[in-house]
UniProtKB/Swiss-Prot annotation:
Pfam families linked to this entry: SHMT (PF00464)
EC number: 2.1.2.1
Top-level taxonomic group: Bacteria
Protein name: Serine hydroxymethyltransferase
Species annotation: Synechococcus sp. (strain JA-2-3B'a(2-13)) (Cyanobacteria bacterium Yellowstone B-Prime)
Enzyme class: transferase
Length: 427
């Protein structure tokens, strides 16, 4: 970084400030993680200089012989990691991966089914503000009002009624394991393609800690960060080589130009890391830590959507906090996601407000707080520390108007950050 400090001290200073923020805060956004120094090095390499439109061995530019080897390595490792027959490592993001699938399989006006965003779905699964909700006729399914788990009776009824061409499973705020076989049965009954978006759980899937959708779904998409702990990017997988050819064309030239080969190198490194036994241990720890945090919060009387978690994330139903604040006579007894998000920021915990199923609050206020364990697990924290974090969060939420309590919480967070340093090699 010395050359950057000399050439552009303003950008260097801002990067250092962001590094310090990451070091001094407990990162609990479920979709974030800390990638390895090796991935950082690959992304910051001379590969960023090279244009490489096309696929390995089929480029539109010369000088791609080493680029081809790197991209093919990423492809081969991705296929091995997930047991896929075909992989495309070029999508710039998970959203780009999903768009390419739509381009390959659908025509404008076709019907698609995806989970309602407020129940844990994703913008790219048919939200009206996203291109997926503008180009296609969208039918949303959700969770059961009692169990807060996927309502498969509703999914089947809607599928039979609307006959979608594509059914999407996989979510951004769903704390339970996904029954891909049940979705396959419904998709077959109505003749629909089945897409699994495993952006949040890819690392757990790759290590056998969540069922693998590749053998059951027509297409699988994912991001390469989150639980996979790679660079920010996308990935498309399929068990069908012929379908893979259509997907490749939908990526290039269908929806992208030149691939980001420095990021693809980072993906190759991350996939290689994920193939090591230590990564399977990491994934198991992610789940154990999430369950330790969930138990700690529940013991303090905080309700979790669906009653807990099977994966790396959980949703706090903050109405349970509001009920306690009202009983104790708090000046402001309403704890919303927006308010909780800001409180977490004050004590240096990074989280995000989130809607919960059947949420009475608007999305920008929300009644939920989403927490995840991947980043802090990477940092080395274990179940004991996650239980302590649960206590810190509960103290903060139940005493939001006590400056002394908030300061004590912030100091406890600072102590944890000092015990588990982040990127010490970066100076």
């Amino acid at each position: 970084m010395a050359i950057l400090a000399e050439t552009d001290p303003v950008v260097y200073r801002l990067i250092q400030q962001e590094l310090n923020r990451q070091r001094d805060h407990l990162e609990m956004i479920a979709s974030e993680n800390f990638t390895s120094p090796a991935v950082l090095a690959a992304q910051g390499s001379v590969l960023t200089n090279k244009y490489a439109e096309g696929l390995p061995g089929k480029r539109y530019y010369g000088g791609c012989e080493f680029i081809d080897e790197i991209e093919q390595l990423a492809i081969d490792r991705a296929k091995q990691l997930f047991g896929a027959a075909h992989a495309n490592v070029q999508p710039h993001s998970g959203a780009q991966a999903n768009f390419a699938v739509f381009l390959a399989l659908l025509q404008p006006g076709d019907t698609i089914m995806g989970m309602d965003l407020s129940h844990g779905g994703h913008l790219t699964h048919g939200s009206p503000v996203n291109v997926s909700g503008k180009w296609f006729r969208v039918v949303h399914y959700g969770v059961h009002p009692q169990t807060e788990r996927i309502d498969f009776d509703q999914v089947r009824d809607l599928a039979l009624q609307h006959r979608p061409k594509l059914i999407i499973c996989g979510y951004s705020a769903y704390p339970r394991a996904i029954d891909f076989a049940a979705f396959r049965t419904i998709a077959d009954e109505v003749g629909a393609y089945l897409l699994a978006d495993i952006a949040h759980i890819a690392g757990l899937v790759a290590t056998g800690h969540h069922p693998n959708p590749v053998p059951l779904c027509d297409v699988v998409t994912t991001t390469t960060h989150k639980t996979l702990r790679g660079p920010r990017g996308g990935l498309i997988l399929t068990r069908d080589p012929e379908l893979g050819k259509k997907l490749d064309k939908a990526v290039f030239p269908g929806s992208q130009g030149g691939p980001l080969e420095h990021v693809i190198a980072g993906k190759a490194v991350a996939f290689g890391e994920a193939l090591q036994p230590s990564f399977a241990q990491y994934s198991a720890q992610v789940i154990a830590n999430a369950q330790a945090l969930a138990g700690s919060l529940q013991r303090r009387g905080i309700r979790l959507v669906s009653g807990g978690t099977d994966n790396h994330l959980m949703l706090l139903d903050l109405r349970s906090v509001s009920a306690v604040l009202e009983k104790t006579g708090a000046a402001d007894p309403v704890m919303t996601g927006k308010r909780a998000d800001r409180l977490m920021g004050k004590i240096h915990i990074t989280a995000n407000k989130n809607t919960i199923p059947f949420d009475p609050q608007p999305p920008f206020v929300a009644s939920g707080l989403r927490l995840g364990s991947p980043a802090l697990t990477t940092r080395g924290l274990g179940p004991v520390e996650f239980e302590e974090i649960g206590e810190i969060i509960a103290d903060c939420l139940f005493q939001p108007e006590e400056p002394a309590v908030l300061e004590e919480c912030r100091q406890r967070v600072a102590q944890l950050c000092r015990r588990f340093p982040l990127y010490p090699h970066l100076g």
